[in-house]
C-alpha cells in the first residue's frame, strides 16, 4: 500500500477524474430515469396527484 502513489505514473490523473465524472453523471441519469419509469417512485406524477393538477395516468 505504501507504493500505491505509483499508479499515477501509469494513469494520467486528469483523464481518470474526467472519466470518473462522466461515469458518475451517466450513472445518476440512469438511476433517475429508472425511478421515473416506476409508478411508486415517479415524483412527478405523485406531486401532480397530491396537488390535483393533472389526472394520473393508470
From Swiss-Prot:
Membrane side Periplasmic: residue ranges: 37-58
Highest taxon above the source species: Bacteria
A biological process from GO: photosynthesis, light reaction
Record InterPro entries: Antenna_a/b, Antenna_alpha, Antenna_alpha_CS, Light-harvesting_complex
GO MF annotation: an example: electron transporter, transferring electrons within the cyclic electron transport pathway of photosynthesis activity
Signal peptide range: none
Modified residues (N-formylmethionine): 1
GO CC entries: organelle inner membrane; plasma membrane; plasma membrane light-harvesting complex
Residue intervals on the Cytoplasmic side: 1-15
Residues that hold a bacteriochlorophyll according to the record: 32
UniProt cross-references to PROSITE patterns, sorted A to Z: ANTENNA_COMP_ALPHA
Transmembrane segments: 16-36
Cell compartments where the protein resides: Cell inner membrane
Topology of this chain in the membrane: Single-pass type II membrane protein
Keyword annotations of the record: Antenna complex, Bacteriochlorophyll, Cell inner membrane, Cell membrane, Chlorophyll, Chromophore, Formylation, Light-harvesting polypeptide, Magnesium, Membrane, Metal-binding, Transmembrane, Transmembrane helix
Stated family: Belongs to the antenna complex alpha subunit family.
Physiological role: Antenna complexes are light-harvesting systems, which transfer the excitation energy to the reaction centers.
Record's subunit section: The core complex is formed by different alpha and beta chains, binding bacteriochlorophyll molecules, and arranged most probably in tetrameric structures disposed around the reaction center. The non-pigmented gamma chains may constitute additional components.
Protein name (record): Light-harvesting protein B-875 alpha chain
Source species of the chain: Cereibacter sphaeroides (Rhodobacter sphaeroides)
Record gene name: pufA
